[in-house]
A protein has these predicted regions:
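A contiguous loop/helix-start segment that scaffolds small-molecule binding in enzyme catalytic cores
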Residues: 1-43
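Core SAM-dependent methyltransferase catalytic element
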Residues: 8-12, 18-25, 193-214
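Conserved alpha-helix/loop element of class I SAM-dependent methyltransferases that forms part
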Residues: 47-64
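Conserved class I S-adenosyl-L-methionine
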Residues: 65-74
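The conserved SAM/SAH-binding core of class I Rossmann-like methyltransferase domains
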Residues: 71, 90-93, 160
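Conserved SAM-binding loop of SAM-dependent methyltransferases across substrates and taxa
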Residues: 74-87
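S-adenosyl-L-methionine
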Residues: 92-132, 139-142
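C-terminal substrate-binding/active-site "lid" region of AdoMet-derived donor-dependent transferases
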Residues: 149-205
Length: 214
């Protein structure tokens, strides 16, 4: 058996029947929820703290075969695609720069179950029907919820927000769209900084809801 670097063998012709075993000692051998932000592609996106992302993924409660729609939730979309590796992720990114960064992350993590789109107002019948959705709340939230419930009347939703003005309106929007709020929580993460001082991270509100409950 001959041992050599793949880069030294890739362009060589093979004249006889042969088999090649490729060993990558740096390959990831397992997945741990809540990847460090340094794992993701830099760019226009400001990623949520890994600890908060881990809680969000727990609240999404993904099965490996489920489909998920992520609205402006880039790192959530990446980890959801890894967790639900037999399902599909529709990543809605309204900004061109964010779509570019998302595409870089898809390549970086070798994902083949992510579809990146720039709009969800008219959810295409060609896109996978989502079992669950994660949304970063914005002024488009009510329209997004209406679209998701239309596509799947029994969809589960998890909503993230740092904005008080939007946070106070979310319960009403959920009920108006036939989604029963099941849990509301606020998360806070503090870390020790370089000067041995406690640095408080942004403390988002997380809303969970279920549509179509009898």
């Amino acid at each position: 058996m001959k041992h050599n670097l793949l880069s030294e063998m890739i362009d060589r012709g093979v004249n006889v029947s042969a088999a090649m075993l490729i060993n990558n000692p740096r390959a990831h051998t397992g997945y741990r929820i809540g990847l460090d932000n340094s794992s993701f592609s830099p760019g226009t996106i400001r990623y949520v703290a890994p600890e908060i992302r881990a809680v969000i993924l727990k609240k999404l409660n993904l099965d490996e075969g489920e489909n998920i729609c992520c609205v402006s939730g880039e790192s959530i979309a990446v980890e959801a695609a890894i967790a639900a590796h037999r399902g599909n992720v529709v990543a809605v990114e309204y900004k061109a720069g964010d779509r570019q960064t998302m595409e870089e992350n898809v390549v970086r993590f070798g994902l083949n179950n992510v579809q990146i789109v720039d709009d969800m107002e008219s959810y295409s019948h060609r896109w996978p029907v989502p079992d669950v959705a994660f949304l970063v709340a914005s002024d488009k939230l009510d329209l997004e919820l209406k679209t998701l419930v239309h596509v799947n009347p029994k969809i589960r939703v998890v909503i993230y927000t740092l904005e008080f003005s939007i946070m106070s309106r979310i319960p009403g929007m959920l009920w108006e769209n036939g989604i029963e709020p099941t849990e509301i929580m606020q998360l806070e993460v503090s870390k020790v900084g370089r000067k041995d001082e406690i640095e408080v991270q942004p403390a988002p509100w997380i809303f969970s809801g279920q549509a179509g409950r009898e």
